């Protein structure tokens, strides 16, 4: 599933092509993704200039004068920038095309767990949308600190890894990046969130930012379906310290990496480096 780094890589790849350009038309070939594609979306966007492309958590927000169209990639979704001249014929899982003068932005989603939604400007700020309003803070924002994590986890018995994944404290720390961040911070993923000290949470906040920044720089992680807007795979997974390395020696101390299951997801950690 594309997480924050993959979505940010997509945003950065798309923005130079669409910001300041007008949508000539929209071809909707599938009316039902995770939720119904809004009726009249093509009419709403025809001849509209894209003013900006933002990211909130794992959602992409395309602003036009009349509002925002919101895209979520789901588990297998991708947005590709393709040349309008010689555009490939749409395949089975190519659901929506936003057509500009010289190129096409194509949404592909084999499993159809992604979403394309519309938020009209008269409904208020897009960040108040029901899918966005309850999200945690952005990991690169000044609001994301060790003090925030410490305060929000007092009395919580859930594991620190599961607390990171929940998304109500900080957005975008998916399974890969939670395991990697906890390794960098030296925190065992099974530790109760409420028992982690403030200094350790300060290290964890720094580790989350560093891990996500490294992943973005490397184009995200490609485990199955993800490719960036240019069709290239990410390669962060090649440099992971612990994720998907069960039984292999720790890159720091040579202890074999262990794998356990938490909340039906695989967790990887070093029993020596993480306490």
UniProtKB/Swiss-Prot annotation:
Signal peptide: none annotated. DNA binds at residues 93, 111, 156. Disulfide bonds: none annotated. A zinc finger (FPG-type) spans 241-275. It catalyses: Hydrolysis of DNA containing ring-opened 7-methylguanine residues, releasing 2,6-diamino-4-hydroxy-5-(N-methyl)formamidopyrimidine; 2'-deoxyribonucleotide-(2'-deoxyribose 5'-phosphate)-2'-deoxyribonucleotide-DNA = a 3'-end 2'-deoxyribonucleotide-(2,3-dehydro-2,3-deoxyribose 5'-phosphate)-DNA + a 5'-end 5'-phospho-2'-deoxyribonucleoside-DNA + H(+). Its cofactor is Zn(2+). Binds 1 zinc ion per subunit. The active site is at 2 (schiff-base intermediate with dna), 3 (proton donor), 58 (proton donor), 265 (proton donor). Its EC number is 3.2.2.23, 4.2.99.18. PROSITE patterns: FPG_CAT, ZF_FPG_1, ZF_FPG_2. It comes from the Bacteria. One of its GO terms (molecular function) is class I DNA-(apurinic or apyrimidinic site) endonuclease activity. Pfam families: Fapy_DNA_glyco, H2TH, zf-FPG_IleRS. Keywords: DNA damage, DNA repair, DNA-binding, Glycosidase, Hydrolase, Lyase, Metal-binding, Multifunctional enzyme, Zinc, Zinc-finger. One of its GO terms (biological process) is base-excision repair. Belongs to the FPG family. HAMAP family: Fapy_DNA_glycosyl. Monomer. Involved in base excision repair of DNA damaged by oxidation or by mutagenic agents. Acts as a DNA glycosylase that recognizes and removes damaged bases. Has a preference for oxidized purines, such as 7,8-dihydro-8-oxoguanine (8-oxoG). Has AP (apurinic/apyrimidinic) lyase activity and introduces nicks in the DNA strand. Cleaves the DNA backbone by beta-delta elimination to generate a single-strand break at the site of the removed base with both 3'- and 5'-phosphates. NCBIfam families: fpg, PRK01103.1. This is Formamidopyrimidine-DNA glycosylase. It comes from Burkholderia lata (strain ATCC 17760 / DSM 23089 / LMG 22485 / NCIMB 9086 / R18194 / 383).
């Amino acid at each position: 599933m594309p997480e924050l780094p993959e979505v940010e890589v997509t945003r950065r790849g798309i923005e130079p092509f669409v910001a300041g350009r007008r949508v000539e038309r929209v071809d909707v070939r599938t009316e039902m993704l995770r939720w119904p594609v809004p009726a009249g979306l093509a009419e709403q966007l025809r001849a509209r200039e894209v003013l900006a492309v933002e990211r909130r958590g794992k959602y992409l927000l395309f602003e036009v004068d009349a509002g925002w169209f919101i895209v979520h990639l789901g588990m297998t979704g991708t947005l590709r920038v393709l040349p309008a001249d010689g555009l490939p014929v749409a395949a089975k899982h190519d659901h929506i095309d936003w057509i500009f003068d010289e190129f096409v932005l194509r949404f592909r989603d084999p499993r159809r767990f992604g979403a394309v939604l519309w938020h009209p400007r008269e409904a208020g700020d897009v960040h108040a949308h029901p899918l966005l309003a309850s999200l945690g803070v952005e990991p690169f924002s000044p609001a994301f600190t060790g003090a925030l994590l410490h305060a929000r986890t007092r009395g919580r018995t859930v594991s620190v890894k599961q607390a990171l994944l929940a998304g109500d404290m900080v957005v975008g720390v998916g399974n890969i990046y939670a395991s990697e961040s906890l390794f960098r911070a030296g925190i065992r993923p099974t530790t109760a969130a409420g028992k982690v000290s403030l200094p350790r949470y300060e290290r964890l906040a720094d580790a989350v930012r560093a891990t996500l920044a490294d992943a973005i720089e490397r184009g995200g992680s490609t485990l199955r379906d993800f490719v960036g807007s240019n069709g290239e795979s990410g390669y962060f997974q090649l440099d992971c310290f612990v994720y998907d390395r069960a039984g292999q020696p720790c890159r720091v101390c040579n202890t074999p990496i262990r794998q356990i299951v938490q909340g039906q997801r695989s967790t990887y950690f070093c029993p020596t480096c993480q306490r």
